[in-house]
Amino acid sequence: MADAEDIQPLVCDNGTGMVKAGFAGDDARAVFPSIVGRPRHTGVMVGMGQKDAYVGDEAQSKRGILTLKYPIEHGIVSNWDDMEKIWHHTFYNELRVAPEEHPVLLTEAPLNPKANREKMTQIMFETFNVPAMYVAIQAVLSLYASGRTTGIVLDSGDGVSHTVPIYEGYALPHAILRLDLAGRDLTESLMKILTERGYMFTTSAEREIVRDIKEKLAYVALDYEQELETAKSSSSIEKNYELPDGQVITIGAERFRCPEVLFQPSMIGMEAAGIHETTYNSIMKCDVDIRKDLYGNIVLSGGTTMFPGIADRMSKEITALAPSSMKIKVVAPPERKYSVWIGGSILASLSTFQQMWISKAEYDERGPSIVHRKCF
């Protein structure tokens, strides 16, 4: 192995919906959906080079003939064989690197089962033979990326949302709250709403179309009830969307009904507090002396916080819950879709971080449980 100096660490943010990967200090050069697709039909033409599994963008482009599966559900890996395929694809096809030559930084949702990170550690060392690795908490990385050391991060991706209060660089584990409601649930809910209107979206491939509608057209209303009234009386919020077969559908109130679920989970029958209330509850679990700093640094992160209007609504809802004199600031960095990856890239490049890696030698000596001792 060459000098540790010239070896760039790899940063891989395995989201439920998207994998973001690249070299520390660079930009995330590989961003692709966390999908493994398998053909629904048997191949009849010889020499077509059909594969038994497709990963990422290739699976996405051939989705019409595939069954698409996401190996990560709610931030937890549910299918390790597929997950291995995704990592293999990341290293060898996307980044074109030999993983045995680079330390690898992986990310994980807080409050994940311990077995999940142990298995991640085991696969990295035993299947990919990495020289060193580390598992970091996603929300903490987002805070790094925003240049703060104190704040509360609301990280909402495709599979899981969580609020993580961090003070002077320390996450406060007792106050971390997790909400298994995120982008994928919003896509499901939009599929239902559109089905009610007579558009049939049922297959795993069609779900991807609905996800695209959601990402392009949905927004968060500042006042939901008022917006519903507006939607009834005028067509100002209606937008058209062209389906892949050329059919055009018009969507109106669905545009803000879909993300409203984040603030009112009861809309999809979930007995949980909305993201604003979860953030508030998380702050209230912290020491009274640090709450002011948390209220003033509410940082949004993850793809599901990309809806237009979400920061203003969040600010309005938390102002209503907090003490009246409290100064509330919701920060929505423009690059928040990738802020976990960016934070990982910053962290892995720090000279002070270099002694934090779990080395192959330590792994061989202690086994997968070493990950709990070395990674927060």
Swiss-Prot record:
Catalytic activity entry: ATP + H2O = ADP + phosphate + H(+)
GO cellular component: cytoplasm; cytoskeleton
Secretion signal, residue range per the UniProt entry: none
Pfam families in the cross-refs: Actin
Keywords, in A-Z order: ATP-binding, Cytoplasm, Cytoskeleton, Hydrolase, Nucleotide-binding
Molecular functions per Gene Ontology: ATP binding; hydrolase activity
Entry annotated with the keyword ATP-binding: yes
EC numbers: 3.6.4.-
Localisation per UniProt entry: Cytoplasm, Cytoskeleton
Function noted in UniProt: Actins are highly conserved proteins that are involved in various types of cell motility and are ubiquitously expressed in all eukaryotic cells.
PANTHER family according to UniProt: ACTIN
Family statement: Belongs to the actin family.
Name by which UniProt lists this protein: Actin-1
Organism: Pisum sativum
